[in-house]
Design a protein with these regions (language model features):
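Local sequence-structure signature of Cys/Sec-based thiol-disulfide redox active-site neighborhoods
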Residues: 1-25
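Thiol-based oxidoreductase modules, predominantly thioredoxin-like and allied folds used
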Residues: 27-40
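Nucleotide phosphate-binding site architecture
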Residues: 13, 35, 72
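A short, hydrophobic beta-strand/beta-hairpin element that forms part of a small beta-sheet core
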Residues: 54-63
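Major-groove DNA-recognition helix of helix-turn-helix-type DNA-binding domains
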Residues: 46-49
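C-terminal basic regulatory modules in eukaryotic proteins
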Residues: 69-80
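Residues that scaffold the ATP/ADP-binding catalytic core of kinase and kinase-like folds
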Residues: 15, 66, 74
Length: 80
């Protein structure tokens, strides 16, 4: 299983930026579109309290929104 999950919707511009950010840095990730996966949508609300996307999970850490500083910190912690 991928260490990085990016929860998205098809119309989310910040989700596209997050995916591009990981691709540019050659960080493998798995995209989970919550429009097609209602269980994943419920999971992010349960874990983060937020219904919006992007939500990024790196290892066991959840990041709400496209926050480069938090993403870089977690990627460094995981040596990705």
């Amino acid at each position: 299983m991928s260490k990085v999950l990016v929860f998205t919707t098809s119309t989310c511009s910040w989700c596209r930026r997050a995916k591009r950010y990981f691709k540019e840095r050659r960080v493998p990730f798995k995209e989970v579109n919550i429009e097609r996966n209602p269980d994943a949508a419920r999971e992010i609300v349960r874990k983060t309290g937020q219904p919006g996307v992007p939500v990024i999970k790196i290892g066991s850490r959840w990041i709400v929104g496209f926050d480069r500083e938090k993403i870089d910190k977690e990627l460094a912690r995981k040596a990705l």
